[in-house]
Amino acid sequence: MIHHDPTFWLLARASGITAYVLLTCSVLAGLVVKSRPFGRKVKTASVTDVHRVFALLGLGMIALHGVALVLDQTVRMPVAALFVPFLSHYRPGAVAWGVLTAELAALITVSFSLRSRIGARNWRRLHWATYLVFLMGTVHGLTAGTDASQPWARALYLGAVGSVVFATAWRVLTRPVRPTPALERSA
């Protein structure tokens, strides 16, 4: 009987789940920056810093997740499968969601530093893709994650999706109405 050390498999699972939680927190912090549910009690700059830290830590956990999968003897993930969708022999479609999620998350995270070069409007447009990253990451976790059928994992995904939906609804419903120029003239 061949015995495989489960260390990297456990690390891959833990880092994947941790990455999902951190990226969920980043999305929520980003929504808090714009919707300001706490009014002026919490400084926008502080929440923005927290948002960035969650994003960077999440990206680090995604990288650790990929490295652990490559080093694990059970899955035997080729390095190229971390960068090219559908190269994985383990659940290729489900893993492809993760590859695309990681790449888009990296692009959005790098855009923090490029905001002045690409312009605020383009940066904001790119930032809307965060919702796509969150959705793809959720699909990846539910379809590739070996713990996805566990009650605690289902509760985690449901809580994350519910929180993002609620925070998004809050942002949309509490957005101040800006008068149009025509309305301003008639007033």
Regions found by a protein language model. Name each.
Residues 1-187:
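Membrane-embedded alpha-helical bundles that constitute the cytochrome b-like, heme-associated redox core
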